[in-house]
Each structure stands twice: as structure tokens, then as C-alpha cells.
Amino acid sequence: MRYTACTESGQNQCICEGNDVCGQGRNCQFDSSGKKCVEGEGTRKPQNEGQHDFDPIPEEYLS
């Protein structure tokens, strides 16, 4: 399963597969047609991955 890597601080930045970063209040979403930046929640991680809903963004994307 593929999923977004979102901040938990409300910045609404996601890294799609590869180095695509969604900004401007958009999130990444994966579906049968591939990846895209969309308004809203984006694609969530599987719930059995632990207490965090989203993966953190790597430090190099936050500067």
C-alpha cells in the first residue's frame, strides 16, 4: 500500500512517491490513476502502523 507522508502540524504538506511535494494547503492522494495533489485529507496510512496518522516529512524538505 502506498500512502502520503504528511506533517502532523497542520501544514498540509505531503511528499508523493518520489520528490513531489504538495503545498498550498493540498495533500497527496494515491489511487488507481497514480498520485496527485488534492484538497482535503489525502490518503491516510493504514491504522495498524501505530499512533501517528502520517509519516513525518524528511528534514531536507522543511528548510
From Swiss-Prot:
It is found in: Secreted. Glycans are attached at residue 43. Residues 1-3 are annotated as: Interaction with thrombin active site. The modification Sulfotyrosine is found at residue 61. GO terms for molecular function: serine-type endopeptidase inhibitor activity. It comes from the Eukaryota. O-linked glycan consists of Fuc-Gal-GalNAc trisaccharide. GO terms for cellular component: extracellular region. The keyword Magnesium does not apply. Residues 53-63 are annotated as: Interaction with fibrinogen-binding exosite of thrombin. Residues 35-55 have a biased composition (Basic and acidic residues). Residues 35-63 are annotated as: Disordered. Keywords: Disulfide bond, Glycoprotein, Protease inhibitor, Secreted, Serine protease inhibitor, Sulfation. The keyword Transmembrane does not apply. It holds the Pfam family Hirudin. Its main location: secreted. Gene3D superfamilies: Thrombin Inhibitor (Hirudin), subunit I. Disulfide bonds join 6-14, 16-28, 22-37. SUPFAM superfamilies: Leech antihemostatic proteins. Belongs to the protease inhibitor I14 (hirudin) family. Hirudin is a potent thrombin-specific protease inhibitor. It forms a stable non-covalent complex with alpha-thrombin, thereby abolishing its ability to cleave fibrinogen. This is Hirudin-P6. It comes from Hirudinaria manillensis.
